[in-house]
Amino acid sequence: MTDHIRDLFLHPRPTYSIAGAAIVLGMDVREVRGWVEAGELEGIDTENGIVLPWAEVVSFAMDLWSQEVIEEALRDELATVIPELVRLARLEVRVPRFEIVALERLAGREGKSVDAVLARELLDFASVHSPWIGTEVPGFAAALQWPE
């Protein structure tokens, strides 16, 4: 998996064929084609068939692999490929126990970490408040749109 992650982020191509995306994602071509047909990967029709833009493949990969795994795989090159505001940071909060239980149960049901579930929910929060936060924090709008 580390090799796939490093290839995708450190050796990006403008677009990937279905087969190329399958290789870089470590998936079967039929599986990638299924994700395209389901609308989870949005391709562009060309004379040579459907291609997937790099940003689309990266967005999909960020759901396929945890961000912790991606950042660990990129090691020293992390800062060169993922913007600072997009990189993981530690946050300690105190919330009611029922919210923690809810996060843990949902994470377990989805096969994800509590961090991943909470990050997804906070992305929605950040998106809702982005018009204001974008005026307060330089680079916020770009981070919210990354990898576009």
What is each model feature region?
Residues 24-51:
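Major-groove DNA-recognition helix of helix-turn-helix-type DNA-binding domains
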Residues 57-58, 112-136:
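Short, basic amphipathic alpha-helical segments that act as recognition/interaction helices
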Residues 2-31:
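Polyanion-binding surface elements
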Residues 17-18, 53, 113:
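Residues that mark the N-terminal boundary/hinge immediately upstream of a DNA-recognition element
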Residues 77, 127-148:
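Short, positively charged interaction helices/loops
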Residues 31, 92, 116-117:
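Residues in the helix-turn-helix
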Residues 23, 44, 96-116:
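Surface-exposed, Lys/Arg-rich phosphate-binding patches that contact polyanionic backbones
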Residues 55-89:
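A short, Lys/Arg-enriched interface patch at domain edges and termini
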